[in-house]
Amino acid sequence: MPSLDKRLSLTRREVEERRRARPLAQLEREVAALAPIRPFTESIGGEEISFVQRVKEADGALLELAEELEVAAVAAALGPLAEMAADNALPMLLTDMVVDPYQLYECRLAGAGAVLLVAAAFEDDHERLAELYSVAGSVDLDVIVEVAHEDELEEALELLDPDSFLLRNRGSDDDGSVDFERTFSLLEEVPAGKTVFSQGGVREREQVAALERSGVDAVILGPWAAAGDLAETLRQLRGESR
């Protein structure tokens, strides 16, 4: 996977290309004409942990199945989100790296109800992070702030005090390894009343149960779950009998 700096640089270039083809003022007018959208996080929670399914491409049959299986929401990049918007009844989360307000207008026009803001991407630019958070709220987008360390959590709480956080279950070296203990440790510092999402390495019922006991509200499942037998995967993760 490319480094964070390379991802940020590539994203900025791509956004500039799209902005030249379709000016921000045009997007602002189109967003202003949209009807209000149901808050994304209203789909999360309840008595049991929720599941959000990441998808790589628009797939009507998969979306119908996900809805039947009571998946809380779907998550995808901008392209698939825009393609599936017309035929999808589930709330949608943008998974793209967001670095520019322009993307928030694109996201809202694609039908999504929430975006991820990665705290590490704004380590040296808290002003831009605050700007993105504010603009997202102005266009009816919920914001989920991804934090990987306690200092990022503290800074996000001080700067934004967001309603939702994403905690990735990854090792301290960010080498692709999975470590749930980092998530459990961070959860102890998340104030009560926040909505917490977990992502990475969740494939067993015992892992889901441990996350739920620790205060996680929703698990974001990777595309692997949708590529196989989604019904069976969810049955196992929920601990349901056949």
Label each residue range with its predicted role:
Residues 177-180, 185-187, 195-198, 204-205:
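Active-site-adjacent loop and "lid" segments of alpha/beta metabolic enzymes
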Residues 180-189, 212, 221-242:
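C-terminal helical cap(s) of enzyme catalytic domains, especially alpha/beta-barrels
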Residues 92, 99-111, 149-161, 192-221:
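Catalytic cores of alpha/beta
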Residues 53, 57-141, 150-155, 164-166, ...:
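N-terminal active-site wall of soluble small-molecule enzyme domains
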Residues 78, 119, 169, 200-201, ...:
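Short secondary-structure boundary segments
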Residues 1-60:
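An N-cap/entry alpha-helix motif that binds or orients negatively charged groups
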Residues 144-145:
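P-loop NTP-binding/switch modules centered on Walker-like glycine-rich loops
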